[in-house]
Amino acid sequence: MPRSFLVKKHFNASKKPNYSELDTHTVIISPYLCESYPMPVIPKPEILTSGAYSPITVWTSAVPFHSPLPSGLSPLTGYSSSLGRVSPLPSSDTSSKDHSGSESPISDEEERLQPKLSDPHAIEAEKFQCNLCNKTYSTFSGLAKHKQLHCDAQARKSFSCKYCDKEYVSLGALKMHIRTHTLPCVCKICGKAFSRPWLLQGHIRTHTGEKPFSCPHCNRAFADRSNLRAHLQTHSDVKKYQCKNCSKTFSRMSLLHKHEESGCCVAH
């Protein structure tokens, strides 16, 4: 550090430090300070005498147990003798016995709660059944999938068009069909309307003369991609449409029909 930044400070030896101004002070706890606080009294445990315990009786096999029961108790059930014997637990049979020993049918509530494992029709009744075509499924998810996809009765609930008599299964298909009646896509040049935006875009190219889809094999170009796809079949080596009379092959079905209508010249 440079000398110019050092500050010389004189030490005053006559000034003594004042220790009473320190922040922390040591506190000495004296035992005489606890005299003003009462100490809690802890109760002593009570010592029981030998007379408080009842003597233990040891029974051996030679001495039978004939302890008298309290008055009013039955030796079999432990309940009051005036109440009679307690009825035994219900068995697995479908009938119970009354006090006279004769069989009596069980109640309707008990019969409904008991599982009918021996009856196979009872297990079939627990399956999930379609309320439209009465088909049964073992799980609820299978029934929901059936209603969504495979139920013929559900498929008959179609959506009908308000402009014509056509019906559709889904609401989305109906909305796409309604566009053929409303024709929301209108050409600004000639006023012709279309149902789809891409149809309008292909129509506008007929006004502008734009043909962005060109053939890589020849110099022809097309305004629509579908026309280019049909043109590329003429360059294909495999021509799958063959004439039955002269065995001539064509790349498109329309060309084959045109060939047959013009008159096929059969070679003799």
Swiss-Prot record:
What's a GO cellular component annotated to this UniProt protein? Answer: chromatin
What Gene Ontology terms describe what this protein does at the molecular function level?
A: chromatin binding; DNA-binding transcription factor activity, RNA polymerase II-specific; DNA-binding transcription repressor activity, RNA polymerase II-specific; E-box binding; RNA polymerase II cis-regulatory region sequence-specific DNA binding; RNA polymerase II transcription regulatory region sequence-specific DNA binding; sequence-specific DNA binding; sequence-specific double-stranded DNA binding
Q: Which domain of life is it from?
A: Eukaryota
Q: Where are the transmembrane segments?
A: none
**What's the chief localization of this chain?**
nucleus
Report the PTM annotation: Phosphorylated by GSK3B. Once phosphorylated, it becomes a target for ubiquitination. Ubiquitinated by the SCF(FBXO11) complex; ubiquitination requires previous GSK3B-mediated SNAI2 phosphorylation.
Asked if Protein biosynthesis is a keyword of the record, the answer is no
One Pfam family hit: zf-C2H2
Report the locations given in the UniProt record. Nucleus; Cytoplasm
Write down what this protein is called.
Zinc finger protein SNAI2
Name the source organism: Rattus norvegicus (Rat)
Ranked from the top, the taxonomy reads: Eukaryota, Metazoa, Chordata, Craniata, Vertebrata
